[in-house]
């Protein structure tokens, strides 16, 4: 999930809201992994990447102007999709490759 912060909202609040709106899941806990600047020198935009823990299925709440497909993809398939160049979104690639590195580091 991704989205803009509402006025007065911090990164965690935005991440929780966007997770539920776009996937239908609620997280018991969100852990900030890191912040990235997608285009330094061009804009001061920051993107916060989070790990969700304790997921509970709820209901998806897409905004009317959003064209989003939300589906569960098995882990093995996700990494095949990366290898095949099917996932092109930079922030998604960073988050997924971080996840893979963590799994390798922890012997999984």
Regions found by a protein language model. Give the residues of each.
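Helix N-cap/coil-helix junction residues
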Residues: 24-25, 87
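Conserved Nudix-box catalytic region and its N-terminal flanking loop in Nudix hydrolases
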Residues: 1-17, 34, 60
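Nudix hydrolase/Nudix homology domain
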Residues: 1, 7, 32, 40, ...
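Short small-residue beta-strand/loop micro-motif enriched in glycine and branched aliphatics
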Residues: 58-61, 80
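A short coil-to-beta-strand element that immediately follows conserved catalytic motifs
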Residues: 26-33
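Active-site-adjacent beta-strand/loop module that shapes the phosphate/pyrophosphate-binding cleft
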Residues: 36-58, 71
